Design a protein with these regions (language model features):
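Non-catalytic, C-terminal membrane-associated alpha-helical segments of glycosyltransferases
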Residues: 228, 232-289
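A short, conserved alpha-helix in the catalytic core of glycosyltransferases
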Residues: 168-169, 173-176, 180-185, 191-218
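Short, acidic, metal-binding catalytic loop of nucleotide-sugar glycosyltransferases
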Residues: 27-37
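Glycine-rich, basic loop-to-helix element that forms the pyrophosphate-binding segment
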Residues: 67-87
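A conserved hydrophobic helix/loop-capping motif in glycosyltransferases and polysaccharide synthases
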Residues: 8-24, 31, 43
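A conserved acidic beta->alpha catalytic loop
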Residues: 27, 44-53
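Conserved donor NDP-sugar-binding/catalytic core segment of glycosyltransferases
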Residues: 103-142
Length: 289
């Protein structure tokens, strides 16, 4: 009698990044899947650059879920998670397409999840142009700094050697138990369509009693972030539109408040951090740094 394979659904939302998406899938094709039944679900949100055709041509086993261009990050991820749950996955590995993977990254995530019941496990994210430098790992809540803050000086050589607990995990590469999805649902795609949805989801899981861990031997190299122009460099009209009208913009004040309200250690800390954030924003707009 053979042991039952652990079913892992890999979920990746994509949009018009064919070259990067294909690079990520090529890297995934080389990982160790011993003892695992792995299926990849790509949610293509209406790409016009031939992404889906390229995937079908080179990776025919990948399941492609089409979108119409309105899904964005959260809804795209959700459609993939829902497909993985219908497939009856034991775990969902939600990730971005701009990733290159160590061949043991998934085995190490699974091993840590099995050793730590009721855990959500993130990979050690590293920059692909500075392969030793940690990227967006270990966020901590600091009320007097305006909310979540990411340590900037961590490297692959300075992080703990064993899995370590964190307050938040970004969605670049995170292993989520199917049990957690059944218990807590999926990302809040209505309020956080394209920014902060992963942070709010992790806060919800944590409040439900799931421990957030990072497995430091699960290496994933990511593309460095690109940022929009800072608010103080924009015209007054554009600033007002972003802050008060464009509720899909991550800098929208309503979204910023809701994020803190739902992910802070307490409601008082949420309000205080939001006020600090607004003060910092005002000072930057006035030319102070």
């Amino acid at each position: 009698m053979t042991d039952k394979l652990t079913k892992v659904g890999i979920v990746i939302p994509v949009y018009n990044r064919r070259k990067i998406t294909m690079q990520g899938l090529a890297s995934l094709a080389k990982i160790d899947t011993t003892g695992l039944d792995v299926r990849t679900f790509i949610v293509d949100d209406g790409s016009t650059d031939g992404t889906s055709d390229a995937i079908r041509g080179k990776f025919p086993d990948v399941e492609i879920i089409p979108g119409d261009g309105t899904l964005h990050y959260a809804a795209g991820t959700n459609r993939g998670i829902e497909a993985a749950m219908r497939w009856r996955a034991d775990f969902i590995a939600a990730m971005n397409d701009d990733s290159v993977f160590h061949d043991q990254f998934l085995q190490r995530l699974i091993g840590t999840a099995r050793s730590n019941p009721r855990s959500i496990v993130g990979s050690l994210l590293l920059l692909w142009d500075e392969p030793h430098r940690v990227f967006q790992v270990g966020q901590v809540w600091k009320t007097l700094k305006g909310g979540w803050e990411i340590p900037q000086d961590m490297t692959a050589f300075t992080v703990p050697r064993e899995a370590f607990e964190v307050e938040c995990i970004v969605g670049n590469c995170v292993l989520i138990s199917a049990e957690a999805v059944r218990e807590c649902g999926v990302l809040d795609e209505k309020r956080f369509p394209h920014g902060w949805g992963d942070a709010q989801y992790m806060a919800r899981l944590r409040k439900a009693g799931w421990t957030l861990l990072v497995e430091p031997r699960s290496y994933v190299w990511c593309e460095p972030n690109t940022y929009p122009p800072p608010l103080h460099s924009l015209s007054l009209k554009k600033r007002l539109n972003i802050l008060f009208r464009d509720d899909k913009n991550p800098l929208n004040l309503k979204r910023q408040f809701v994020l803190r309200w739902e992910s802070a250690p307490s409601k008082i800390a949420a309000v205080a951090a939001f006020l600090v954030y607004c003060v910092h924003l005002t000072l930057k707009a006035a030319g102070f740094r």
